[in-house]
């Protein structure tokens, strides 16, 4: 089989949440445990950091990996979903897993897949863990797919756990209140393994403290330990300078190409995690920290976080796709000088569409679109729902065509935003 034939088999034969939604969700870890047992329990063959949270876990995971790379560690990175290439999910020192490994793993385990019937995500976890063990990584950063307690990645015993924050997303599976969702995320807290929480939230702090106490795990709330601010920030700048105050070390200036205001919490959480890794014996210098934050994009291939595609007109794309993520984006869009705001927007059909639409600015020009995945909400349906919130514009089902139309309509001093869904963002990157 060719690489493309293997991908076709994996995408079509295994349930994939990113494509079909809840039909791919498994309510226990049985399949993952069975699959990894058949593979020789590769998760026991490398050390790791486990990252969960509603928003920011992707940026956090990439920053941690970048810093550890700069510290000289052979570093694995497992994230999801991918934007353009399936292999983005599995990297070592920034390099994607080779096509040959994906082909070999799939061909060798086809009968096992038929027997166990793993989801697409469970399969990718098995592939990543086997690859990290084979390549003898020093450490791997493992990002959860959804939740924590029942997430397929939750068969590892990491050096450290990190939870970014809690917001409303995947409520059909994780719960309808922040404490309920927090309990699911807190499921990654392991016995005796320290845990960092990037952002203190009144509704969830006690949930995390209780779980950590039950597991006899030390817990650290990053925003209760370290102050962080941005020295200078303009939304169309290629980088920002963050000022991080550690009471034990003084002021540190960290330059990052991740310029969203929401990165303040992520960088602080990353710093708190690195402090704990140092206490565990990992050699991570201040220079490695500075270089890792500054080179996160080039080191790890991270894309789609407040990414500027062009100037005049300014085009910005972001993968934020739930109420919390969209809220951060809107706050930042409001700081950008422009004549007119154009919004190229598409969503998936299992999100709180109304909750997001009611937040969007009514003075923007809209281009309602849909990504090329089965979960995508029909562009016409989205436009109809948006009209109920006073949002009006054109229906252009093709994402690239919608962006092209916005570019034709926009003046050089206008701002075009593309997003609403990870999959919409992926089609213009």
Outline where the language-model segments fall.
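Active-site-proximal loop/hinge segments that shape catalytic or ion-binding/gating pockets
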Residues: 421
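Short internal beta-strands
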Residues: 78, 194-199, 343-345, 364-372
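Short functional linear segments
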Residues: 1-53, 60-62, 66-71
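C-terminal helical cap/extension that packs against the catalytic core
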Residues: 201-211, 216-220, 314-317, 323, ...
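Acidic, Mg2+-coordinating active-site environments of NTP-dependent enzymes
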Residues: 118, 140-143, 158-253, 271-290
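Short Gly/Thr/Asp-enriched flexible loops that form oxyanion-binding sites at enzyme active sites
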Residues: 64, 149-159, 428-429
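ATP-dependent carboxylate-amine ligase catalytic core
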Residues: 21-29, 34-44, 70-156, 172-174
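Nucleotide phosphate-binding/pyrophosphate-handling subdomain across enzymes
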Residues: 45, 134, 139-144, 152-162, ...
């Amino acid at each position: 089989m060719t690489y493309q034939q293997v991908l076709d088999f994996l995408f079509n034969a295994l349930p994939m949440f990113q494509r079909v939604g809840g039909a791919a969700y498994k309510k226990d870890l049985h399949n993952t445990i069975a699959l990894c047992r058949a593979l020789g329990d590769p998760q026991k063959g490398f050390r790791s950091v486990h990252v969960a949270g509603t928003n920011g876990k992707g940026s956090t995971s990439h920053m941690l990996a970048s810093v550890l790379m700069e510290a000289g560690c052979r570093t694995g990175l497992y994230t999801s979903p991918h934007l353009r290439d399936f292999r983005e999910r599995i990297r070592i020192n920034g390099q994607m897993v080779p096509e040959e490994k994906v082909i070999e793993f799939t061909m060798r385990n086809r009968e096992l897949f038929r027997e166990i019937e793993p989801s697409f995500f469970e399969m990718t976890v098995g592939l990543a863990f086997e690859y990290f063990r084979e390549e003898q990584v020093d450490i791997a950063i493992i990002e959860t797919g959804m939740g924590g307690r029942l997430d397929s990645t939750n068969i590892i015993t990491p050096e450290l756990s990190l939870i970014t924050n809690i917001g409303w997303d995947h409520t059909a599976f994780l719960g309808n209140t922040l404490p309920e969702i927090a309990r699911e995320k807190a499921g990654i807290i392991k016995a005796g393994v320290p845990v960092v929480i990037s952002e203190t939230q009144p509704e969830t702090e006690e949930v995390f403290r209780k779980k950590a106490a039950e597991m006899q795990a030390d817990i650290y709330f990053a925003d209760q330990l370290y102050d962080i601010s941005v020295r200078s920030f303009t939304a169309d700048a290629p980088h920002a300078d963050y000022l991080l105050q550690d009471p034990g070390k003084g002021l540190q200036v960290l330059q990052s190409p991740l310029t969203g205001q929401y990165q303040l919490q992520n960088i602080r959480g990353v710093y708190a995690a690195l402090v704990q890794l140092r206490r565990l014996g990992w050699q991570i210098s201040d220079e490695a920290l500075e270089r890792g934050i500054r080179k996160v994009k080039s080191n790890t291939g991270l894309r789609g976080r407040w990414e500027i595609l062009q100037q005049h007109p300014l085009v910005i794309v972001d993968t934020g796709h739930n109420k919390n993520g969209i809220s951060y984006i809107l706050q930042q869009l409001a700081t950008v000088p422009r004549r007119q705001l154009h919004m190229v927007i598409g969503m998936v059909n299992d999100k709180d569409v109304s909750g997001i639409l009611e937040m969007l600015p009514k003075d923007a020009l809209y281009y309602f679109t849909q990504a090329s995945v089965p979960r995508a909400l029909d562009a016409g349906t989205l436009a109809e729902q948006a009209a109920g919130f006073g949002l009006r514009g054109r229906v252009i089902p093709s994402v690239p065509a919608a962006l092209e139309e916005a570019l034709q309509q926009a003046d050089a001093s206008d701002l075009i935003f593309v997003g609403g869904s990870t999959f919409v963002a992926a089609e213009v990157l």
